[in-house]
Amino acid sequence: MIEYIRGELAALTPAQAVIEAAGVGYALGISLNTYTVLQGKREVKLYVHEAIVTGGRDDSYTLYGFATVQERALYRLLITVSGVGAN
């Protein structure tokens, strides 16, 4: 598992951050809270949640980034609720 990614912020939108680390650009879905924290920064560190979906035609591997460990923990708690997901 990926615990966190630290690197240069290559691109930022309210829904996504791209972090370049060791020559690889990682696209991570982010919250508006994390977006606010990242604005104006060059070097960043995001705590990662990996979402792997298999078993159908649309298998996917998605990364979500959070500004703090606490925000990631809250997200992980929320997705345990039936009917709640990343979108």
Feature locations, PLM:
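Conserved hydrophobic positions within beta-strands
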Residues: G7-L9
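Short coil-to-beta-strand transition motifs
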Residues: M1-I5
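Long, highly charged, low-complexity intrinsically disordered interaction regions
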Residues: A11-N87
